[in-house]
Amino acid sequence: MTETYDIAIIGGGFSGIAVLANIVRAASQPLSLVVISRDEPHIYGPAYSTPRPEHLLNVRAEGMGLFDTDHKGFYDWAAARDSSIKPGDYLPRRLFAEYLTAIRQKTLETAQQKNISIRFMRAEAEDIRPGTQLTLVTDKGDIHAADIVLAIGNTLKAKEDAQSEPRLVTDVWHYDYAALAGAKNIKSIAIVGSGLTALDSIISLLNCGWTGQMTCLSGGAQLPKAHPPVYDKTKLKAADRAHFVGQRPSRIMHELRKSARGADWHYAIDALRPFTQDIWKAFSAPDRLRVAQRYFNLWNLHRHRCDASIRAQADKAIAGGTLEMVQARCTSFHADAAGVDVMLKRDGHDETRRFDLVFKCIGVNYAVANNPLITKLIKKGLLAPADNPFGIAADAAFRAYDGAGGVIHALGTPLFGHLFETTAVPDLRHQAARVAADVIALREGALRSRAAGAGE
């Protein structure tokens, strides 16, 4: 039997919970919602599901609130539990997951008061079919909905070829690091990738009592930059929008260097945040593709930074020889019971290196081709691709489809090719608020039309 809801949200991570909470908070009429996720309701995506206290947020506590009208919401919640917490602290991600659970519980209580029904359904979304209503096809059955929200979060590159080999680790957040402390047969570990996920592994290895050799393998061989130890907001000056929006990438790089000259580069980068998406949208299609392929990693290093204490631990390991940074591209892996052979491209030559253990920390794959649902919907013509391989198109209300049967909204990762900066909490909470407002306007408008028709 097909179930019918007003709204179906695909994704139960931060984006999905943010859309749900915003809808319930703002709704003035009864609604029915279903949240579809492959995980249990208390799991908010891989990074936020980590149980490890050393895995920290990379945004200050005061900026991690779920609601766009309350940026300090997370800090206020955390400080009420622990008065030693400061607004500028980078807190454990597991604490942030507890905050999301508290938001979810409060949302359920508010929904009950407003006669809004919510169901959490553990299922895999497989297809969407248009008709008199949209039909969401899942592996647990079909769902009719007038509005479907794609809040599907990040697709990790390591999941593309995830293996069950015990020597080749793809889930670095739930690995039993403590077991390594006394493991005499694990003397060399490779970390593939050098972004924030790689830092999670490095820090856990440094803190678990293991004393072997780490080798970080990546094309850039650079770890994320650190935030200033103390963020001085008085140094954050407004950037001249005209010097950046509508300019070619080379000109923007020139302006950035000029802004940072004789000053702290952190604040020059951060000054672009209010209009980074406008810079991206003003690029020509060839420039967007060029920036995504050639400069994205460089941008990420400087824009998506880590807590200074985390970077200091990694730098100490590099200086002491415990951590080796190697510029190389990993082409394939062969794991056996005793270790992993890693095939590399290094300085134009093929090379094979043997490690006792490998952590794959190669981050997010923004390519449309990596997401089966998005790929299927584009092939059917239900969604339009961006003008590059990295996402889908959407309008100002984040509608990706508006036609027969209803509306499909999208936020977060699927919009990377359209918006560029679209995965950090400050971006996601703004998108969630906009999506929720549009969903409510559509649903409550439909209810008013139905009531008016009944009265004629």
Region annotations inferred by a language model:
Residues 2-40, 46, 83-242, 253-447, ...:
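Flavin (primarily FAD) cofactor-binding/catalytic cores of flavoenzymes
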Residues 49-73, 232-248, 309-312:
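N-terminal glycine-rich dinucleotide-binding loop that anchors FAD/FMN and/or NAD(P) in oxidoreductases
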Residues 68-77, 250-258, 419:
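Extended, charge-rich low-complexity interaction segments
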Residues 74-78, 407-410:
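Active-site-adjacent bridging/hinge elements
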